[in-house]
């Protein structure tokens, strides 16, 4: 840990050689961004004093909530996340730290990450392990826990990462690791890959996370935990360990109600096929006797273990992640009292440096109270545009560096960066290339920046990337299209803040929430999206952005839905959005300010965490 430094302005971990530095006296100070370095240089003594007095020492007994997630993204340099679920978990813990919510996070340590992504010349995705050293970021803890997997005792150790809030309050994140001397080779590899391996591998990981996580918290001394929050069903086996512990304390009965009162469950999946299910033959072999099999079958389903059903049956508070997602989830699981708390993003993390400086100047205090961003309606338009031009220049410089393609600073730049999977319909905008070429000939230049990984076993997702790369080769300079490699949080920040328009085209109702448009709004970038997930709540047509199609779902076939949505996309792009961007800049700036004031001020994790505290943690 000697090589790890803390940014004195925001508290983020900085690895020497990757961040920025400044000299102060005889010290070298490290920063995660140019913005933080500039803020430090304004008042160096103040920030150094804050760094040395931060409250790292709150006792473990005071932690009241344990937040479990199979992936957590706290920074681009730690590959313990793959996409939206993990980034949301990281943003949640950051807001908990800012708001001083007594939470401890639990996840797995992925020594080889999700995967490192490269493309061949045709857009074929090639995967490799991510090389990183946990000791550069984390503190290894001495305690061990044990789980039984296929009648073997597997030792689990823990690493700790401190998520430091803007006030200095610390939320510890515990990362579980089976790479322990004495474990069998296969067991040591259980925490190597995120979403890797087969069903057997995935179930073993969920045993380590859910059962091992509860046991590790106990070993570490987190004795005051009152609520266990499962962020998606991967952690649901923790309810079995809670039942087991409850039975040890009260041998006369299985107290389902007492366990239920301690559990909170957030579901993120809008389709039945997305919920993990395991054959009971595998469950019996892998899990052993945490609780009697008939109890698992009673709570998790008769034919197979459905981890979502297990969590639903033993959680007092259950929620989807958007209003529409609540409705979809109630249809999937009738009879369960499913609520909704719409997702958000961590405002400080996802606001680029130029907009941070803008908000600091005109809306001081916004960082720890993002609701204040509603005041953005009065931001000077010239300053908003200058901040955007700076963000766009950073994106274009990155594109040039990575691809050699020189994009225009003046052309309408459309961004699309998210997981490459079929339902996201990343190539919908290219359904009729002639329409786009006609726009360019009419004086509306367009350029596109794409990024996103396809799961290694998702052949359709990989083919989607190849199709976009093929379109890029065909259009050449007429409509520049780039697909950037190795999408992560750092790349996401640059693409989201540097685009002029944020495109999102998921097939309805398959987007549970989505958060990239919320991040765009924090940087004054309006969304252009199908009405699904959070955008049903966030879209004010022509004010915060634009909708593609209506809210109707289902059709005779997917092709007719695609044709209808593509037609609406082209109609609005060529008749409303492009003319507004090129011919009515002042009106475009109104939309930018409204996206900040109406979307960023609400769709943030500070508001979201406050709702979890009120609705889920306190009752």
Q: Which residues does each predicted region cover?
A:
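Short, flexible, mixed-charge glycine/proline-rich loop motifs
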Residues: 1-4
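Short cysteine-rich clusters marking metal-coordination/redox-active sites
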Residues: 7
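Cys/His-rich metal-chelating microdomains
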Residues: 13-17, 34-35, 39
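Short, isolated positions in well-ordered beta-strands
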Residues: 14, 29, 154-156
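Short Cys/His-rich "knuckle" micro-motifs
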Residues: 17-20, 44
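Short linker/helix segments within small regulatory modules
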Residues: 21-28
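Conserved hydrophobic/aromatic "anchor" residues
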Residues: 30-31, 40, 47
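Catalytic cores of carbohydrate-active enzymes across secretory and cytosolic contexts
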Residues: 53-619
